[in-house]
Amino acid sequence: MKTKRHSLPGQVVLVLQGGGALGAYQAGVFEALSNAGIEPDWVIGTSIGAINGALIAGNTPSQRVPRLREFWQGLGSASIGGNWATVFRGIPSFFRPRPAAWTVPLAPIGLDEASYYSTEPLKRSLESLIDLETLAQAKMRLTVGAVAVRSGALKYFDSRDVPLRIDHVLASAALPPAFPAVRIDGEPYWDGGVYSNTPIEAVFDDNPRRSSIIFAVNVWQASGAEPNSIWEVMGRQKDVQYASRDDTHIARQKQLHQLRHVIRELARQLPASKRDSTGCRELATYGCGTTMHIVRLLAPSLASEDLFKDIDFSSSGIRDRWNAGVRDALQMIERAPWNDPVDPLEGVIVHELSTRTGMEVRET
């Protein structure tokens, strides 16, 4: 039974990486949050993270988990035959092969058709599962990342600023060369994961910045064992690439945010006569007193997975990842590390589960 809404110290942000079938873990995390009465104020996603985010933000509270489950069960029930069957046949509710792209790859067919698969099935699925009116109302804020094909610049489409449509979600999930670019106002976009697969910086760049509990749900393994075969090398390369230097991003944001806290404190120590001068007031605007708790949740490696794990849409794979998301999120919710006292000058506190012990680790 769902409990009453939690009262957390700050806005609740859910940050979702891209990762194809690995996104089932994210759905499990959200189910645990929902059942605990923790409702995100803001969801930020890339690729499958954008799809999950739209299914959450684009439905009323009572429909969010059911819509997620309907989407993921539809993928799993259609994946009989293993990963190679997915490559050659596609998934009826997600993508279907374009035969010409496989047989005549040099044909000048245009950017809108230049992909191995069509995502028209995904578009129809999302249209049936997302309430566009609810999405446009932006009661739960949604931000999705995509890359402009021509400039290579990363762009965040934010429901706070513009009404989001299904095409914005498809653009964020348009991973080349598998999926075609999607045009927004005439400009073609690809999957935001091409540029940055972990869009956590959007929280720190927000204006105005707010104290936040950030559930950062990562589905790729930044660290791993030494590979022993070409197959394992390919899998490890994919993990490193799509983990998207998450540790580095967070370390940089911690340094910047601590400097903001120091600036704020220094400004407060100035005599009133200096503090009120135009120059000091301008410098003080670079200060900030917000506190960011980053709760990192990392999808586990399944015993059977290989370099094709991101297209493992088997019912068992989806079930195991979903259940792992529920389990890990519940453990963090029960621990509630964001309630622990913090140094007022420490603006960013990272909490994560140890992959060795399963216990919560606090990193300041």
Residue ranges and their predicted role:
Residues 85-217, 224-225, 280-300, 305-306, ...:
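Active-site-adjacent alpha/beta core region of enzyme catalytic domains
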Residues 67, 121, 125, 134, ...:
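Exposed alpha-helical structural elements
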Residues 53-55, 146-147, 346:
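Short secondary-structure transition/capping segments
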Residues 219, 225-287, 321-326, 336-364:
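Terminal low-complexity/disordered tails
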Residues 66-75, 185, 341-346:
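Short alpha-helical "patches" and their helix-cap loops
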Residues 43-44, 216-218:
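Short internal beta-strands
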Residues 1-12, 140, 147-150:
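Small-residue-rich anion-binding loops in enzyme active sites
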Residues 2, 8-15, 20-116, 120, ...:
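Patatin-like phospholipase
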